[in-house]
Amino acid sequence: MTQDELKKAVGWAALDYVRPDTIVGVGTGSTAAHFIDALGSIKHQIKGAVSSSDASTEKLKSLGIPVFDANEVDSLDVYVDGADEINGHMQMIKGGGAALTREKIISALSRQFICIVDASKQVDVLGKFPLPVEVIPMARSYVARELVKLGGQPVYRQGVVTDNGNVILDVHNLNIMDAIAVENHINGIPGVVTVGLFANRGADVALVGTSEGVKTVVK
């Protein structure tokens, strides 16, 4: 199977976790896009979705799925999204698509987080994929210097403005042994909106696309 076929397989497999008459949290990226396609096939069975990006909102609406603002819901039954990396503790790096802040808000609202990935995203130690940090523009240089102190090499993601109007620093060369501590430390730097480490709130279930089929990993 190609990588895209693996992504499609896990996107459709995630439908098993969607209950009727609920509002579904929906992520961003190529794997999440397959889940949105799958969601379109049961759109009359659900109330709608809360979306983590303008791109996902556009795709949901094009399929006729109602989109709710996060402020309109008290909680979500399930949130389905991909990841750039996931370790054995179900902690993730996310934010390659620059939607990390909204993704983190939706994950906090959700009772269950289903991570959908192909097997290439599974790692023993997080950090080979550059760690995205969303930053208020005026704090970019200050935050970059603070990230250097952590041993990372921050790179400004040129030409990218998040849906919230902020910028992204991608931190290279981090070997993240204690993901919760790193998440808390970076989130405490003034000017940081959020970091793309999902460690305090990791995934509850990972659906992993492999050549043998979809493998289910439970926290």
Curated annotation (Swiss-Prot):
It catalyses: aldehydo-D-ribose 5-phosphate = D-ribulose 5-phosphate. Pathway: Carbohydrate degradation; pentose phosphate pathway; D-ribose 5-phosphate from D-ribulose 5-phosphate (non-oxidative stage): step 1/1. Substrate binds at residues 28-31, 81-84, 94-97, 121. The active site is at 103 (proton acceptor). Gene3D superfamilies: 3.30.70.260, 3.40.50.1360. It is an enzyme of class 5 (isomerase). InterPro entries: NagB/RpiA_transferase-like (IPR037171), Ribose5P_isomerase_typA_subgr (IPR020672), Ribose5P_isomerase_type_A (IPR004788). One of its GO terms (molecular function) is ribose-5-phosphate isomerase activity. Its EC number is 5.3.1.6. Pfam families: Rib_5-P_isom_A. GO terms for cellular component: cytosol. GO terms for biological process: D-ribose metabolic process; pentose-phosphate shunt, non-oxidative branch. Homodimer. PANTHER family: RIBOSE-5-PHOSPHATE ISOMERASE. Catalyzes the reversible conversion of ribose-5-phosphate to ribulose 5-phosphate. This is Ribose-5-phosphate isomerase A. It comes from Pectobacterium carotovorum subsp. carotovorum (strain PC1).
